[in-house]
């Protein structure tokens, strides 16, 4: 794999109805219904909305035999109206349901964590090697008949591993690790290969973007070693809604698409299913438009480990680099110093002039030729100003530099001036590739100057800014290169809708939180809902956010059902999980505190629980 130059991973083609995936096919877009699969009319109507929005596959929850059998009616109704979209049955806990669904759906998703193994209980189990091998043989004995049904019906399958539903068996041997998630998948893949069943798609998902990216990278590596080329389905589970859902999804999925991984994408938003499609389409189009870009001659640093990257070692300069959290640098070239108190930047790049009334305590960056040592101001240099750096008596200096600008003169200057913080800039079609090449060259030269990434856009829609900036930063954060972000946006044309500076600042902070390197607000782990969700998910999320959005650093899980609920919420402080029609269970960490609370009382009960444990503060 060339991490500097974009190209898609070569995969085998999988036939899914009339819409094949992998091989030379484009990256496919999909979503999932949240209606009851026994309600034919509701499912058909929602599937049509997904297709009309651009969706190429529609997945439906299939929790029982009745739901599996009704896929035939849903399929027939769609085709009668000219909708030839392949249907995907989503099966958990019951392999018999998968057997039935394979007769009516174009693809069946099974979850290795609960296909044969018992549902996760978080208990540690002890196995001898022989006992463990026997458990794997049980999978083979049950899985092969299912594969035979799929062969007979020309049905594809997805082996869909979720971080939140790994079995106790896998957890006990491998722990809560990427290695465990990958092995959970490989157990099934090896059976498929042995049985010569190749219409297989794979997914490994998590709500934690770092775990999700590292695990998919590892899976692709292991498959390559074993000669497997199955296509990959990408997604961040429980990404949430609104800006959080878009930023988290774009960061995680974008980091993988940037490396050519991924043959189909689902952006899991806690919104109407059809709302996911435009977001996924924008993300895929943005990442794939860099194909055939000019070559980037990067050299991977020997100490860099792609499968398990660690933060690049840097020297702290004031509060940048070293062990410090990544900083946010805002741009205020027009003198506007209006900030959101929750998302106040660490530094402000003011360009050619300081504001008339600087904010006390705010740190300003101004162009070096205008800097005269004012308090709380720091000079910024361009590459052509390197000869003058030594003449400035400042303990913190910024240097705007491109990858090609990192020449012998710049390297010599940086070795002599550890107080310089680099601000990477690029106009290359594959900006991420150049930024990676710059970071690796710094390591190759033994330079420890902190590195901030200048991400600039010309967007009139907030969603576009969120998707593109998060996708561009994902791999840089996960690879350990990010000591800060400078996010700047200009509208495309005069008179266009201007995205406010405060929204741009909030986006920068949101990216760092989605990458799990800096927390600035409450974090919500909320699923998109499906046919198993028996309460009003969207309105519930809105009510919980309204009551808790000021609780910085608190993690709250809001889950439709127990399939991934307790598992994906494992690192959440509190959890709100559907327990039946109109019933909710509340969790503190992994412990269920109260069960079967009426839906209309549950949000208030959640707030009471947070207050009882001393984690609630008034606004």
Predicted regions and their residues:
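A structural motif
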Residues: 52-57, 105, 197, 261-262, ...
């Amino acid at each position: 794999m060339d991490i500097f130059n974009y190209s898609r991973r070569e995969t085998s083609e999988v036939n899914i109805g009339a819409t094949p995936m992998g091989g030379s096919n484009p990256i496919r877009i999909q979503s999932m219904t949240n209606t009851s699969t026994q309600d034919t009319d509701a499912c058909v109507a929602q599937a049509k909305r997904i297709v009309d929005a651009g969706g190429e596959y529609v997945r439906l929850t299939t929790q029982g035999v009745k739901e599996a059998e009704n896929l035939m009616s849903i399929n027939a109704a769609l085709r009668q109206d000219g909708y030839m979209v392949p249907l995907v049955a989503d099966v958990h806990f019951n392999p018999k349901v998968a057997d039935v669904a394979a007769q009516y759906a174009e693809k069946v998703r099974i979850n290795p964590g609960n296909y044969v193994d018992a549902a996760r209980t978080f208990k540690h189990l002890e196995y001898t090697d022989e006992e463990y091998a026997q458990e794997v043989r049980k999978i083979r004995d049950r899985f092969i008949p299912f594969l035979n049904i799929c062969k007979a019906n020309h049905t594809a399958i997805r082996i869909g591993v979720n971080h939140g539903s790994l079995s106790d068996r896998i957890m006990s041997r491998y722990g809560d690790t990427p290695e465990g998630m990958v092995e959970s998948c490989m157990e099934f893949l090896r059976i498929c290969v042995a049985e010569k069943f190749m219409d297989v798609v794979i997914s490994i998902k998590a709500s934690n973007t770092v775990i999700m990216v590292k695990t998919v990278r590892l899976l692709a590596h292991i498959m390559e070693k074993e000669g497997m080329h199955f296509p990959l389905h990408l997604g961040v589970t429980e990404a949430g809604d609104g800006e959080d859902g878009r930023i988290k999804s774009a960061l995680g999925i974008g980091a993988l698409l940037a490396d050519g991984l991924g043959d189909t994408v689902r952006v899991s938003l806690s919104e109407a299913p059809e709302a996911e499609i435009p977001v996924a389409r924008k993300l895929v189009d943005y990442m794939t438009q860099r194909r055939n870009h000019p070559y980037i001659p990067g050299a991977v640093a020997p100490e860099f480990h792609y499968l398990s990257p660690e933060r690049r070692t840097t020297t702290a300069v004031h509060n940048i680099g070293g062990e410090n959290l990544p900083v946010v640098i805002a741009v205020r070239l027009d003198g506007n110093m209006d900030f959101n108190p929750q998302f106040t930047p660490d530094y402000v790049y003011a360009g050619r002039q300081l504001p008339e009334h600087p904010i006390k305590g705010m740190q300003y960056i101004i162009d070096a030729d205008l800097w005269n040592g004012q308090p709380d101001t720091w000079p910024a240099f361009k590459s052509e100003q390197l000869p003058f750096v030594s003449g400035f008596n400042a303990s913190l200096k910024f240097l705007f530099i491109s990858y090609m600008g990192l020449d012998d003169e710049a390297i010599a200057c940086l070795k002599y001036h550890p107080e310089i913080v680099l601000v990477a800039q690029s106009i290359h079609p594959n900006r991420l590739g150049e930024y990676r090449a710059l970071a690796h060259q710094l390591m190759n030269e033994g330079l420890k100057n902190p590195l901030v990434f200048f991400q600039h856009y010309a967007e009139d829609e907030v969603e576009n800014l969120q998707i593109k900036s998060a996708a561009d930063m994902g791999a840089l954060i996960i690879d350990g290169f990010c000591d800060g972000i400078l996010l700047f946006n200009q509208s495309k044309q005069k008179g266009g809708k201007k995205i406010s500076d405060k929204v741009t600042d909030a986006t920068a902070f949101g990216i760092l939180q989605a990458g799990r390197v800096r927390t600035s607000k409450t974090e919500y782990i909320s699923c998109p809902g499906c046919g198993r969700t028996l309460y009003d998910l969207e309105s519930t999320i809105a009510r919980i956010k309204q009551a808790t959005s000021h609780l910085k650093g608190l993690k709250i899980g809001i889950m439709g059902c127990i399939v991934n609920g307790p598992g994906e919420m494992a690192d959440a402080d509190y959890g709100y999980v559907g327990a039946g029609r109109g019933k909710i269970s509340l969790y503190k960490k992994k412990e269920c505190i109260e069960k079967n609370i009426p839906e209309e009382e549950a949000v208030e009960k959640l707030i009471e629980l947070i207050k009882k444990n001393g984690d609630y503060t008034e606004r």
